Amino acid sequence: MEYLSHADKYAEELRKSCLLMHKLADSPAGQVQTLRSLMGAGLGSAILKEGNPIALHYVMFIPALMGQGTVEQQAKWLEKAYNLNIIGTYAQNTNDNGYLGFDKVRIPREQLLMKHSQVLENGTYVKPTNSKLSYATMVFVRVVVCQDVTLNLRKAVTIATRYSCVRRQSELKPGDREPQVMDYQAQQHKLLPPLAATFGFQLAADHLWNLYNTANNSMEQGDMELLPDLHGLSCALKALCSSEAANFVETCRQSCGGHGYMSCSNFPRIYGQVTAAITYEGENTVLWLQVARYLVKTRKEKSGGLSVKYLIDEEKGPRTVDTTPEGILRLYRRVAVGLVDIAIAELENNSRKGYAPHDAWNHAAVHLIKAAQAHARLFVVESFVDSLKESRLSSPVRSILSQLCELFIIYWILDRSGDFFLCANLKKEDLLLLNSKYVHLLAAIRPQAVNIVDSFDLRDEILGSPLGCWDGNVYQRLFDEAAKSPLNQKNVHESFHKYLKPLLKSNL
């Protein structure tokens, strides 16, 4: 695939995706689970490396019919969509965004999704009972985005961790054998926080998925109470997971040295897929500001959903610093509250200066975005800490998850220490203690790093990288990949005789 033309890549992926759909139709057992795997960053990425041309149909088009179509519309269109008699698409040709314009065209009413809003026969538009009802499909897709970027991050961390345990370099002790790169604390600092993040993001995405299902069931009964909170959380988590995963994937790539920049390492493709998620289904800056609006409203009105309860119920008792996971969770809450209050103060200050409301908002955007990001990080940390209370966890699993959780939540504090100094009463000695804990956790998790990434159960075909191969035979596989290049099919490429050789003999 790497050496096909752009047009040939598209045709080949379309051929394979259509063949897969035929195979799937012949094997109904486990069809739903297989379909989900084919549309995401797992099995689908192994077979369809350049993307699945009909993934959009299953991920967005069918959910939109289910969530926004009337009973009659679903009866007419859903079966056709499931059987691929109709296919939903953006009509993209991957060169640019297409568009469709109408001039005095009357769209049949039955082809307007009218579960929540309607157009009457006389042309009157009837608004939905809640303006955010039409967001249901986007909320669903944002949950899928969180899961997808997390899986891509798992792939990147697996590749980088395995390679770092194969690659040996320099001398840790003079005269000793070159150690595995993973034995250097600096490499652990690069790779173990992303490893821990895969668990935090997945647990938060699972939590959000459960909330989505609960809210969806409530909405079917006409209860919209959970919708604002769900919308705010889905915006926050999508923005956080995509942006953090992009940064972590790039760190993983850099941790593999020059080999990480090779096309066959699969890092360029993984990075491209994750960074794209920063923009689609809501550009992250726009989403952060939507979240901020919800937070400001909640703080001012003292009313909101479960995820923002901390903005309504003030912390009681002395604001001491406790470095246990539960204590650190309280620090995150203080920061989230503090940054919302700072943003509100900035808005009020702008209003006193005479700014119109929209200008006051624009001039407070930096503070508002920071508040929204703190809210998102709090949700991830809460999901991670709460998961450790699960009684079903075995003692060894609970132990390693606890270490990963503690590493991750301390990593974020050290990375954003200014916010914790400003809002959480953190002092220099607290930060030094957390830093000491952090490096201790790096050393404690290091011996289990390969076992942890192996537990992801990602086959070599899904990783698609010689650097992350399960058997560790990295360099032979790199040689084999290089041999596939059309440039390496001849000992001396004809361009040498045509261009370089005359230059060498020209006596410039």
Question: Model-predicted segments: where are they?
Answer:
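Flavin-dependent oxidoreductase catalytic core characteristic
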Residues: 1-508
